[in-house]
């Protein structure tokens, strides 16, 4: 074999090894920061994750904390549990599988507290039109499993929980979408103003709901009693992100979300 061919082969082998090493190193770095996980995952430590929230809860005395990786239909919550379902897609709630509703009902009827925060949205749609499904849902695998187990039986959030979704169409638009907003609260003990990053809001609220925060006059964080427990819905998740908890931490708001329960579960299963 000519000497030049051997040298070329060695160079190619070295380049391949260097490339594979670089890819492996990049993967390790990404795994360490957690950005291989979806936004608002508690396993993610970059600004878009919620690991700071999880580790803060971990440091609390007399609190039992865990992550849930199982499908929701297998969840059997203990009485007095606060269940965080963070970074949900509002598109998946038009409608939802009946079994998902049943799981939520079991949680709150046992005295639990369900906290659902939705992905920040900057989108538009004609009022009255159904939300268009995203090509890849944050919790598609979980939803499909539940649909199959219930023979595609679905339920309306409006009919069951007394709430609907809408988008504020009257916001100014910048190059990257809508600028950050403020959410304001009149409730004693809560921060009067927090930053807000979504034009999603709740409408068609029945009388059982209490409005915790509004943005541009629209309800964006709401709470209601449900059975023996309670339900909190937030139209944005930014305020519980690592970025927000490092720059504008709101302990009073986090305390309200936790409620008085001693067991806390942070769901990871809906990220797929």
Name each model-derived stretch.
Residues 49, 53, 99-103, 153, ...:
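Stable alpha-helical elements in mature extracytoplasmic
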Residues 201-272:
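A glycine-centered loop/beta-turn motif at secondary-structure junctions
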Residues 58, 108-109, 258:
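Anion (oxyanion) recognition and catalysis
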Residues 80-125, 137-139, 228:
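Short alpha-beta junction capping motif
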Residues 120-216:
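An acidic, glycine-rich "communication" segment
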Residues 2-75:
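Aromatic-Pro/Gly-enriched surface loop or interdomain linker
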Residues 39-44, 89-93, 242-244:
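Second-shell loop/turn segments in exported
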Residues 61-62, 88-94, 209-213:
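Short, flexible loop segments at the rims of nucleotide/cofactor-binding pockets, characterized by
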